[in-house]
């Protein structure tokens, strides 16, 4: 029976290994093609040859090589202190939980699973009548999100003050399978940074059983009137000291520009203390214990006008590697390694070492 059990385990591992090989070579093809185009058409630092070497050893994207971590001027010892997004994805696939991934990926499942931390109205457009839709949008502003959307794409705001054909809009939202959420009124302390967007706090947790550690946190702000605060929409972000809740460093955008004050409003970023920080930490730790096996999570939260900590969304594979490393230009690979060992009892670097071609 022992031999049969071993064979079954081997068979179960083969598809995962083959999948990882496919992922690696797909990344290699895409990343090297993109980098070659960039080096051919832009005035850049480093060289394509050096980038290829960095990819083989660390699986970095062109953006990580050129901007996020500035690999182009680091020696190999310094480069090895950073962990790339692709390396983190290997760790997530190996150590993450499939059921948790499904819940975090599905916006409706997520809102239901974490309802104790959700204080706003929400519904799928198809689950309410036109009459109810019209009553709601005339009562408060609504954010419309594509049910399968990511990175803020396709999101728009429905304002009760707008002159619209509400019936046409309703059937468009139903047909396109949109999720509707009440616009959150944010506390003035955070709203003042950029009033047009909901300026959120990303808190990254690593958990196993009742043991939960806050690995890092960011404060994200919109810019130029955008309703979205992430970097894909031009937003900026600043690292938060998880012990104090204070922003100790300037914010950064996706092109390595730094901001001690907000570029639009002039509000001071560096030195700002996030309100209700201890409550935010407690909320995220409680959320990480709501369902079993949430080993990794990025919690997007805000402080509403009633002083409540509200969870907006969650990410089962948070980009904390870039978020924590990029602003400081300091690698956190060893910190990630030690935290996962302390919390989960597993060495994540052993999982990615086989990809060092």
Predicted segments — roles?
Residues 148-150, 185-186, 210, 220-222, ...:
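Short, solvent-exposed loop/turn segments at secondary-structure junctions
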Residues 90-201, 206-210:
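Active-site nucleotide/adenylate-binding loops and adjacent lid/helix of ATP-dependent enzymes
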Residues 20-136, 284:
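Conserved N-proximal alpha/beta basic substrate-recognition cap immediately N-terminal to
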Residues 184, 188-194, 223-304:
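A long amphipathic alpha-helix within ATP-dependent nucleotide-binding catalytic cores
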Residues 193, 199-206, 212-220, 228-230, ...:
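Beta-strand scaffold of nucleotide-dependent catalytic cores
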């Amino acid at each position: 029976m022992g031999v049969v059990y071993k064979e079954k385990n081997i068979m179960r591992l083969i598809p995962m290994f083959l999948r990882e090989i496919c992922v690696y070579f797909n990344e290699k093809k895409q990343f090297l093609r993109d980098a070659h185009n960039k080096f051919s058409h832009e005035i850049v630092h480093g060289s394509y040859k050096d980038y290829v070497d960095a990819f083989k050893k660390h699986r970095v994207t062109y953006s990580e090589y050129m901007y996020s971590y500035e690999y182009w001027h680091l020696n190999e010892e310094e480069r090895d202190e950073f962990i790339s997004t692709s390396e983190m994805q290997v760790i997530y696939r190996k150590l993450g939980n499939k059921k948790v991934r499904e819940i975090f990926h599905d916006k409706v499942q997520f809102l239901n699973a974490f309802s104790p931390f959700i204080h706003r109205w929400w519904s799928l457009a198809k689950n309410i009548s036109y009459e109810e839709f019209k009553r709601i949008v005339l009562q408060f502003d609504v954010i419309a999100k594509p049910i399968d959307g990511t990175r803020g794409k396709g999101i728009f705001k429905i304002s009760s003050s707008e002159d619209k054909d509400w019936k046409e809009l309703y059937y468009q939202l139903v047909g396109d399978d949109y999720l509707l959420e009440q616009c959150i009124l944010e506390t003035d302390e955070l709203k003042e940074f950029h009033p047009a967007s909901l300026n959120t706090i990303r808190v990254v947790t690593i958990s196993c059983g009742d043991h939960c550690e806050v690995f890092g946190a960011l404060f994200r702000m919109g810019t130029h009137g955008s309703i979205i605060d992430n970097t894909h929409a031009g937003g900026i972000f600043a690292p938060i000291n998880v012990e104090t809740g204070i922003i100790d460093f300037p914010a950064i955008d996706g092109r390595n520009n730094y901001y001690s004050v907000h570029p639009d409003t002039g509000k001071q970023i560096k030195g700002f203390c996030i309100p209700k920080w201890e409550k935010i930490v407690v909320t995220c730790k409680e959320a990480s214990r709501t369902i079993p096996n949430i080993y990794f999570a990025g919690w997007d939260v805000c402080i509403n006008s009633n002083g409540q900590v509200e969870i907006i969304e969650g990410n089962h594979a948070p980009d904390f590697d870039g978020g924590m490393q990029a602003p400081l230009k300091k690698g956190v690979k060893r910190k990630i390694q030690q935290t996962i060992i302390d919390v989960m009892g597993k060495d994540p670097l052993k999982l990615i070492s086989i990809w060092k071609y």
